[in-house]
Amino acid sequence: MSYLPLRTFTTIILLIAGLTGHAQVTTDTSAVAETVERAGEKFLRSPNIRSLSVGVLIGGKTVRRHFGELNTGQGNTPNDQTVYEIASVTKTMVGYLVASTVEAGKLSLDDDVRSFLTEPYPNLVVDGEPIRIRHLLTHTSGLPGFLPLAWNGVFETFTPDVPYRFHELEQQYGKEEFWQDLATVQLTEPPGTTYAYSSAGTELLAYILEQVNEMSLTKQLEMVLTGPRGMAHTKLRLAETSEVVTGYWMDNEDPSPANFNSLWGGGVGVTTTLPDLLRFAALQLRADDPIVKRSHEVVYTNGGSRHIAYCWNVWRDKYGTSYNHHGGTSGTQNWLYIFPDHDLAISLITNHSGPKTAGKMNQTVHRIVRKLVDTRR
């Protein structure tokens, strides 16, 4: 799940977006490595931060660096085999599957989502406008952030017991309860009107993908994405798993439980490694791939700075276009940035989560991009 406040999110993205453009780009791996190491060490000095993994893909060359310890005093620095929860960055992979399904002619962005459901759900339409596939992709459906409603606001309390409260709620919830709750949702305006982040919407999208393609989301990921791209360590984890790295919430000394993922896993379910994330990033830099091209098409804009593609945040200025997504659990946070104009992608992952973590990570991205992309030329 992702709980970064909208104002903070917008400020961070505008800061990064202003750096992208027609410029001289550093591709020498030793220079890139030095930049990453300096930025990573600085991030590691932040309070409560135990570790960081950074990957940079630039000009077809990859630099990966790992910092700190996953558990204080144990000397266990993360490495290329460390498996992380990537939370809402999962949504970008779901977006890729949707683009693949649309490209195959099996799904349309204008399809009424009710046509894929087993009950009529008359509550999913306002003034004659139903929730459509495009609305689920762009968080404009009007659905709440989470179903059940009890999940909403838990993270924003920022209390020490957040990981355990949320985990308990997850364990008590399943698909049957999801459908019951979906029938009680009351939309306040026609879908497509307002952006409001919704993991519930992406879970519904995952269900629809399973119906249309007649296979599980797990199998679709394997066939369409992770298999062809050699992402052997990228999995959709449903229910608890002990295979992911331990993470920490705010000042807590005890680790947070991993996501339970009792639904379809389309909102937060993927776990992966840094090398696999960079393989996914390399795919996003392939302008010749028709599925990638489609998945980067803007589906919603508010007429201002917010543009949304297939689950990607899209940012534009006079220097070009970039794509990004944040993911956060009660124990990890990560950002994935794609800068096609500079053949550049950056992934950062830390096993700490708190209200300031995302901002600190983006300051680190800022330092890296500023060194690698010289906008003065």
Description of each model-found segment:
Residues 136, 205, 277-280:
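Structural scaffold positions in well-ordered secondary structure
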Residues 176-188, 249-261:
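The feature captures the short pre-catalytic strand/loop hairpin that immediately precedes
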Residues 136-137, 182, 294-295, 299:
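A generic structural signal for nonpolar/aromatic side chains embedded in well-ordered alpha-helices
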Residues 24-68, 210-213, 218-223, 227, ...:
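Catalytic loop of the DD-peptidase/beta-lactamase superfamily, centered on the K-T-G motif
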Residues 45-53, 73-135, 189-201, 265-268, ...:
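Short active-site loop at a secondary-structure junction
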Residues 85-88, 103-152, 184, 207, ...:
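Active-site helix/loop module of the DD-peptidase/beta-lactamase fold
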Residues 1-8, 12-84, 100-108, 134-145, ...:
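N-terminal leader/targeting segments and the immediately adjacent pre-domain N-terminus
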Residues 24, 69-71, 112-120, 151-155, ...:
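Short linear capping/connector segments at secondary-structure termini
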